[in-house]
């Protein structure tokens, strides 16, 4: 091999790699399929940085969902690989998985521009700060890390476990826009996560918005969404009356008095007062307006 300045040409190119052009443009995040893919990757993918310009985006899911990774591969016009593997876990023997890996620096930089952190990210993820397709983004996140189905009692639900406060705020605002209802959710004491559960008619409204005809989605979750769309409330199932809205005076009283005093004065349950106080304090800590 011919040498130049004491090193081989191969070594020179390794030390001075050509910059990788972006596979996609930042503005393409507004496209439904791209927003969906980004939401899915944010929920279940892992962005790793190595030395220099090395690194990769990797996402591993059950082999039965290989279809969705093939769709992602077709959306990203740069080299990537899809590989299958079989391993035993604490829960399943001979678990079959499929992984999609992209090393292209331009694509990895684009994911960072959109807001995807490297390494552990569950507690800091949030919706993109630039224009994106909201419905498709949250469908991607739910397909990647949520559940869609029926309870043992036959009630439809859409469930999503969230760690990040920023992502929770965005998702609750999205749910309010779809269902017309404001939700207050507290972290579970055991796992320190938010479990956002949408059920019954609200679940029907949500899947109608999320899983629209022709959208990119996991086929099995699209099938479940179709089943939820057909659900009707049993005649003998009572409809829970709407809760009383919180006024500015109520909010001020809760912040200035004890839980028991607030329960008696406002005529509300312990859980209602406790959740409201937690939400108000978090809004104040984040610089929000109460």
Predicted regions and their residues:
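Internal intein/HINT superfamily modules and their associated LAGLIDADG
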Residues: 1-290
């Amino acid at each position: 091999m011919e040498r130049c300045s004491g090193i081989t040409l191969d070594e020179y190119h390794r030390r001075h790699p050509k910059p990788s052009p972006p596979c996609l443009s930042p503005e393409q995040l507004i496209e439904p399929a791209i927003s969906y893919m980004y939401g899915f990757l944010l929920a279940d993918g892992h962005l790793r940085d190595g030395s220099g310009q090395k690194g990769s985006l990797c996402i591993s899911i059950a082999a039965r969902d290989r279809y969705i990774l093939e769709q992602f591969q077709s959306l990203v016009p740069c080299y990537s690989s899809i590989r299958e593997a079989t391993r035993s876990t604490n829960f399943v023997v001979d678990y079959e998985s499929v992984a999609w890996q992209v090393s292209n620096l331009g694509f990895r930089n684009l994911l960072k521009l959109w807001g995807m952190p490297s390494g552990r990210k569950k507690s800091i993820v949030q919706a993109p700060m630039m224009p994106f397709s909201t419905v498709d983004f949250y469908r991607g996140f739910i397909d990647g890390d949520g559940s869609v189905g029926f309870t043992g009692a036959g009630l439809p639900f859409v469930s999503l476990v969230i760690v990040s406060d920023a992502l929770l705020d965005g998702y609750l605002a999205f749910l309010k826009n779809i269902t017309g209802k404001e939700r207050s959710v507290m972290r579970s004491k055991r796992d320190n996560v938010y479990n956002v559960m949408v059920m019954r008619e609200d679940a029907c409204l949500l899947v109608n918005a999320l899983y629209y005809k022709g959208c990119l989605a996991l086929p099995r979750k699209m099938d479940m969404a179709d089943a939820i769309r057909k659900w009707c409330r049993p005649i003998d199932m009572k409809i829970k009356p709407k809760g009383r809205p919180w006024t500015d005076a109520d909010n001020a009283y809760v912040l200035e008095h004890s839980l028991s005093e607030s329960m008696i004065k406002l005529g509300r349950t312990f859980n209602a007062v406790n959740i409201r106080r937690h939400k108000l304090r978090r809004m104040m800590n984040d610089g929000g307006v109460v």
